[in-house]
Amino acid sequence: MKILIPFILTLFYSCEDKSTNSDTIFDYTMHKNNRVASLKMNDSDYDAWVNEDGFAINEDRLRVVNDLYNVFEDKYDFIFFVLNEPSIPENLLYYGRLVGVSNSVQGLGFQSYDNSLQYGSDGKLKAVMQLTGLEYLKYGPALHELAHQWANFALPTHSVNAPGEDLTSYLYTGHWGFTGGSIPGQLGGFRQNSLIENGNNSYTVESFGPFANGGNGVPYNEFELYLMGMLDIESVSDFDMFTNITSWSTNESTYDFTANQRTTYTSSSLVELLGSRIPSHINSQKRFELLVIVLTKESLSDEQWDIVDAHAEWFSKEESDGTSLYNFWEATGGVGSLNIGY
């Protein structure tokens, strides 16, 4: 009996513990603080996931997410995969990537869609994201990728590959490119009130990124917040979008560019173009459930657990930490919030 009783107790505990992996392809471990978890692949699966970008392969991504739902409840709006890598692997070409799963919001510039059943979710899951370094939840591009759930599908923005003369700009899907905003946006663009008109379609603005503006070091701008359902359209300041860009030069703190087409957007012209956002900022969802999973081929060390758990706590905190980085609550001006945990 002295041997049998511990055996029975252990068996009972294991049957109740979702981390036992009895019905899963991969091995799952939960952190003691119930915020983050790890998904352990064998060496060949993990190496293929990283070297062949398994996240971008629909079949591979669906396999992993469906397996998750054998362990975790279908209550999450977003699932974040975080690679257990010190920095972006050389085989991957992105710091973060979001794949939309479902979106029923109207007025964003696209038709609603719902592929959640393919992932094992009954309409709850909105998107899955991969961050290619262990610390990218805190330092970015976590905010940037979240913005892609709502933007940019609204405006036909333009960009160019590099500074130069006699350039031909191109449609810049998903980002703001050479577009102004209340501040430089998470998805790129310049500060509108820095715009100087030089004449002959020549302009000067504060330096900016057409693609992004510094990881989690900037909050969302007004138009981004509107698209996310966090701000009234009337609170979005007028801004300009420049296309047909033919030259771009960089100075110490400013950029000069020439663009043959300038389109000014106002709150009324945006509604005319996109239709009203439904649901509006009044009754839109502002609190989201987020699952953070570290993908790894080795068991996480105590230090690695501490890093990702602390970053998850910080990213979901509903207060300012007084640093130059923005968590989700800060980036939305205290309107939006995240719950990370299981």
Which residues make up each language-model segment?
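Short, solvent-exposed loop/turn and secondary-structure capping segments
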Residues: 90-98, 151-154, 160-162, 239-243
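Bacterial Sec-dependent N-terminal signal peptides
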Residues: 12-30
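Sec-dependent N-terminal signal peptides
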Residues: 3-12
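Active-site recognition of the HExxH zinc-binding catalytic motif
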Residues: 136-160
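Zn2+-dependent metallopeptidase catalytic core
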Residues: 24-139, 146, 254-342
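Sec/Tat-exported extracytoplasmic proteins
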Residues: 72, 150, 154, 231-232
